[in-house]
Amino acid sequence: MAKDWLEGIEDEYDVVVVGSGLGGLTGANYLAKNGHKVLLLEHHYQFGGLATWFKRPGGHIFDISLHGFPYGMVKSCRKYWPKEIADSIHQLKDGRFINPQMNVWTSFDREDFTNILVNDFKVDREKVEAFYTHLRQMNFYDDNTQTTGEMFEEFFPGRSDVHRLLMEPISYANGSHVDDPAITYGIVFSNFMSKGVFTFQGGTDTLIKKMVAELKNNGCEVRKCALVEGVDVDDKKVVGIRVRSQNTGEEEFPVRSIKCKAVLSNANVRNTIEYLVGENKFSEDFVAEAKAVRNNTSSCQVYMGIKKGETIPNIGDLVFTSKAAEYSIGELTSIKTSSHTFSVYYPETRPHLSQDRYTVVASLNAQWDEWNDLSEEEYQAEKARMCEECVSSLESFIPGVRDKIDHIEAATPRTVNYYTKSMQGTSFGTKFEGLKVSMELSDQIEGLYHAGSVGIIMSGWLGTMNYGVITANKMDKWLYEKAKAV
């Protein structure tokens, strides 16, 4: 018998949160802890958005995006989630950059990175320190039109190798590149340089289950397999949402209408405007501005599971490798790219498992159009090619690893789009101009807010979590004032 995933929900809530990415989860938790009646809806059968996982036969557990985040994640988790979540965050000390311009092994903290730039790349220490100082002094509200590439050239003129070392890991972290505003680079890079790269010990499955348990403990109603089909607006005010239970086999359940005072959309900001709400509910100028927002790049992953009982040597935690002569966003995002990052998950990732297990995930940046335009036959062939190239590349670090892999599969921008509904399969939300549109939604429609990955600086694990709190704080104040006025 098909299951109605919406069974038992009430007809009205203070806030409905659409989507359970880290921004949605954290925003929902903030609002629930502050006494608001919150309903969180996720269309997928797993919570977490891109911060999720999947299992495969053979005891494999694959993390979608648990590759690394800055130390600021510890502070945010301590502040907005139970202490045990923050206490499970551990440092990844082995990052590697291997390409025709360099072979670097680093802990990716400021001291080590500085020594590499000075000793290996022969950059004056004063110039490196001046660069760091410049990044720290950057302010989001400054009217600074300088691009990241222009900033690199100012401090390290003609040094394409240095530019590559500085830019490539951030391109993987949030999809940005040298033509984006320098502020988007400065904020993110400075966060990483604080104390290095960190991850969650226990895996994404453990993390998200703890977060969902905390949400329920704070009185938040959470439902998965629930697709929000639209936000209802009357007289420029949010009045409710429409949602349908799904993933239930052959039976189709009716659309449910839920009343609410406010909606926190954790969807793509353009999806929110163009599909969830509808363009006709906004001013023409705002719609034009929103449609001009560029979606960020997408990504591919190749998931490789090591057989039970087999081991692999320590080759580093994050291995950035490329055959490209120099850094190029065109090459980095091409369907034929030679650039990818191996995230290696050793037994320490999930120490609670009864047996030591190893997995490797290769991540590649990608362009939506290149993958979306393929026929089904071409699509399958490209996925197979990508898998083979990643295994061959991994063999250069671990000879014979092919024989130790008993599961391999690929995800593409199409996969991201299917499971997250994110426009053009973007893995990192929008380019910088999307942040202004996101922040001004409630100026257009009372009670409508957004906390999805946006503007580059609000992308990635830390950015989206913090943006969830920023937006939820605005909502909390608005709901409080609204209640006082009654």
What are these language model-derived features?
Residues 100-184:
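Rossmann-like flavin
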Residues 307-411:
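C-terminal segments that line or cap access tunnels to active or ligand-binding sites in enzymes
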